[in-house]
A protein has these predicted regions:
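Generic structural signal for residues in well-ordered beta-strands
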Residues: 94-97, 395, 431-433
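Conserved DEDDh/DEDDy metal-dependent 3′-5′ exonuclease domain
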Residues: 2-13, 19-162, 259
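Short glycine-rich phosphate-binding loop at a beta-alpha junction
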Residues: 77-89, 256, 314, 397, ...
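Helical catalytic core of nucleic-acid polymerases
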Residues: 90-166, 175-185, 226-361
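C-terminal polymerase-core module
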Residues: 311-318, 325-370, 406, 410-450
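Acidic, glycine-rich two-metal-ion catalytic cores of nucleic acid-processing enzymes
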Residues: 2-3, 26-67, 191-294, 345-388, ...
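Short Gly/Ser/Thr- and Asp/Glu-enriched loop/turn motifs at secondary-structure junctions
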Residues: 99, 173, 193, 299-301, ...
Length: 450
């Protein structure tokens, strides 16, 4: 039986039931299609795992005596709270909790499988009222409970085999909390240009909002919302012109890693690369020359990436760096075949053979590299979000090798210096800096921060 919280007695019963029990929370938002930054919280379905109690804590639903959402901060637990889509829930709740999808993904490389949890009532309701807003507030609460019960059962399948670790706790904090911070900032747009380029009207107070999917097979986040793929915005068709600064005295600023993967790999295998152009360094070894032509420099880039992603043959394995990479790939594959899993470098996330398909040594290495890239960047984003608190500028977009900022010119040159040092780790991972009045045709300004 589900208890719907309607008065103080019910509310105290909920709080006492949660005190020492792990629990599963499934928030339901008023509108099924709005970005969570522009949405409201209809109610929360709460399940206490120790005592198997079910609650509905309502805030806007028409079937219930709704509670003041400010009371949500009173609901805490000494047990672990697992929230469905915690990143979205961060707008409403700042208490300690963990992401239920991340828990499932940590074990299987997939988020909770909820494709079949919609009830017939949900499907019919969404067809009838697809042009209306906030329909979850008036879809019958009994139908919501039916759906939440299905969701809880899927969660419990993953919970039954999950082991909480310090690494998971840290990954949850770094990944969920930091990407929540980026999503909250949004991207300011020229409304006319944006609507023209994307045929979308998802603009709220002059901004559009991204949503990062953290549950990909390798861990590298994808980034889509409202039909727009923000991780792969076209550089040629002018669509990037629609992204502009929100500040009266502002511009967009992009910091882009230089030869990022090569340096990450060097760090993984413990190889010291010189503090020079990576492609020039390798090109001189490829072509046995002291001076590279422009054509040889471009060829050097292609050769390096072909070797790292396609496999290293015997001739190139004679170059010390690539010989070490080849040994690392071989050792990684042997461990994978022997134990049936490997762990990522920093957060020790397991990657099990049963969940990785058609694997081979180079593909496994690429999985490990992309996981390592993401874990490195989580530390970087966390450091950036801490550093940026004292400035007016905002971090507004992340891709695997670059960060985009809405730069307030009042922050001055010191912001650029602090930012460059934070992202590059004081030069360990060199970055290039570009700036512009919009996200299209940005100019290199790296030398101005030297």
């Amino acid at each position: 039986m589900v208890t719907i919280i309607e008065d103080n007695t019910d509310f105290e019963y909920l709080k006492n039931s949660l005190k020492d029990s792990d629990s599963f929370w499934s928030p339901v938002y008023s509108d099924a299609y709005k970005h969570y930054t522009c949405n409201a919280l209809s109610f929360i379905y709460i399940y206490t795992i120790k005592t198997e109690l079910e609650f509905i804590l309502p805030f806007r639903h028409t079937d219930c005596l709704n509670q003041d959402i400010e009371r949500l901060k009173e609901v805490t637990s000494q047990g672990d709270i697992f929230v469905l889509a915690k990143k979205r829930f961060g707008k409403f709740y700042s208490g300690k909790c963990y992401d239920a999808d991340l828990m499932a993904w940590w074990q299987t490389h997939q988020m909770l499988q909820l494709t079949e949890t919609n009830t017939v009532a949900h499907d019919i309701w969404n067809r009838w009222w697809h042009n209306e807003t906030n329909t979850n507030d008036w879809l019958p609460i009994t139908r919501h409970i039916e759906r939440c019960t299905h969701t809880r059962k899927e969660f419990m399948k993953s919970y039954a085999t999950f082991e909480m670790t310090p690494e998971f706790r840290q990954y949850d904090a770094y990944a969920i909390d930091n990407f929540f911070a980026i999503e909250q900032n949004g991207l300011h747009v020229d409304a006319k240009l944006y609507t023209e380029k994307f045929q979308s009207n998802g603009i709220h107070n002059g901004k559009v909002f991204t949503e990062y999917n953290l549950y990909t097979s390798t861990g590298r986040p994808s980034n889509k919302f409202g039909g727009v793929n923000y991780a792969a915005l076209n550089k040629e068709d002018g669509c990037r012109e629609s992204f502009v600064s929100r500040h009266e005295h502002g511009m967009l600023l992009e910091l882009d890693y230089d030869a990022f993967h090569v340096r990450l790999i060097a760090n993984m295998i413990g190889f010291d690369l010189p503090d020079v152009s990576i492609h020039e360094y390798f090109g001189k070894q490829y072509f046995d020359t002291d001076t590279l032509s422009k054509e040889q420099y471009e060829q050097s880039k292609q050769i390096t990436f072909r070797l790292l992603y396609g496999g290293i043959d015997k001739d190139f394995a004679k170059i010390p760096f690539f010989g070490e990479v080849k040994n690392y790939v071989s050792s990684l594959w042997k461990a994978y075949k022997r134990y049936g899993f490997i762990k990522t470098e920093q957060f020790k996330r397991p990657m099990y053979a049963e969940h990785l398909h058609e694997m081979n040594p180079n593909k496994l290495f690429n999985y490990q590299l992309q996981a390592g890239e993401t874990e490195h960047n989580l530390h970087t984003i966390n450091n950036v979000n801490e550093m940026i608190q004292s400035y007016k500028s905002k971090l507004i977009l992340y891709t695997y090798d670059s960060l985009l900022f809405d730069y307030n010119l009042d922050d001055g040159k010191q912001f650029l210096i602090d930012l460059k040092n934070t992202i590059s780790e004081n030069g360990k991972y060199p970055v290039k800096i570009k700036a512009g009045i919009n996200y299209h045709g940005m100019k290199d300004v790296t030398s101005r921060t030297a």
